[in-house]
Amino acid sequence: MVRVLGWACSAASACACAVAVGLGACTAPPKDPMAVLTNPRSLSEQQLGAIKGLSAGARPIDTDAAREVRRLVFAPGIALGTRQAAFDLLAEDDRNGLREALETNIVRMDSFEFRRWVLEQIGARGMKDFTAVVVNSWAGAVPVWGPDERGRPEFAALAAMYGPDRVPDALFAVLNESHPTRQAGLRARTWEILIRLDERAALRDLVMKSSIRPDDAMLRDIKQLVDELGILPETREELLWLAKLRANASPEYWKAAGEALRAIPEDRKQGFELRGVPVALAARRHAPELLSRSREGLYDDLMVRLRTRDASKYSANFTGWETGPRRTEVLGLQRDEVRWIDLVACNLALALVDDPAVRARLFDMGDRDQQDRRTEYGGVIRIDDAGNWSVVEVRPRVTGSDLKFEAPQELFDQGYTALFHFHLHAQEFENGGYAGPHMGDFGYANSTRANCLVMTFVRRDTMNVDFYRHGPLVIDLGTVKRP
């Protein structure tokens, strides 16, 4: 028997007792490692001992053992040392299985410390066959790692394997050598990372000067977009948007888009985003003079217009939410952040909500939304060839919460050519505390890259209107009255 602080423990359970009182770890290999690995009640030290037991046994480990060890790499609540030992064993005995699991799951890891360690190991061990793992990890933002792309552990991993000056070359190799269909997601993520590394010129050269294989729809679509509209997409969302447009938009749409963009001075098209195409189209149909206006002129005029509309009187309540140090809806505080296309979009938004027919439609939707406790209401706003506005109501994908609008596929499909995605905050007629987009709305704008509007009841006869897009950037456009 082993006696610890008055607790009597058998030799078989000494390990658990030692852990219970914090006196250290017992990692001796068990007689049956698989019994430990498949037991959900096993302690971390026992799991680590099981990995040691497998390492000391017949090698390579069999399929069942590899599956259980892979689980330890990703399952929640596993000790860092156990995860690291599992990675080491799999890197030797189940390299392909480890790589495939990491390609899918590295972005889901709940331990950023372990994720960084994995990336460091990939670089230090020269695991070039894990390059896709590094790309997949790099594709998503990790706030604790900061905004500097070259300071991220993924950059360091590729630099260790290929050389600090060859990281873009390694990424271009992924883009060029990955299968256009089976690895479309990987290629889109790689494209976005190269944009973030400021490789725009090289990407433009790739699509304009290189031969593109017939089945490479992504690069073919990008080349046509650059040829016809001069736009280089930057994000995965824009690449999806482009693919949908290429598949569904009519030749007349592309012709009209080209004519609209040719009306825009070249200096306004620097960094032009795909979301700018429906804005330019709408401006050409409704107010073509907007396309020749300067950013400064549009900004100053919009500031004057907003002074008479109660702009910034109402705003959403973000108490308890981390929104960053400069979250604001006031145009006057965002002169440096607002873009030319945002100002054109805001002018169009004011024009449409000043149209009595549009306001009647929005207030009708708002009244029905206020009575419907199952969902928020929303849809898209278009403009036809004659310059007439069209408010298209789209039913939500699911219902069950009066605090959100679950966008269905129909909204996305219609939204690719629409001017605005919109939804209502109409839980109450006096809803000023929700006047503006909130956290879920910011996520939607970031993921779709769309131009968005939210209309909020602040009185029974008054709605507040906010424009927002990715970033997030929000501009309070003031209030409109029931017609």
Label the predicted regions.
Residues 27-38, 60-74, 95-107, 128-143, ...:
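Amphipathic alpha-helical scaffolding segments comprising HEAT/armadillo-like alpha-solenoid repeats
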Residues 374-384, 453-456:
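Short beta-strand scaffold segments in enzyme catalytic cores
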Residues 45-60, 81-95, 104, 115-128, ...:
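Structural detector for internal amphipathic alpha-helices that build alpha-solenoid repeat scaffolds
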Residues 10-22:
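Bacterial N-terminal signal peptides
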Residues 367-373:
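Short consensus segments that form the blades of beta-propeller domains
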Residues 207-304, 405-483:
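Active-site-proximal loop/helix of nucleotide/amide-processing enzymes and allied scaffolds
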Residues 42-43, 77-79, 110-111, 146-148, ...:
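Short inter-helical turns and helix N-cap capping residues of alpha-solenoid HEAT/ARM repeat scaffolds
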Residues 263-360:
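Long amphipathic alpha-helical scaffold segments
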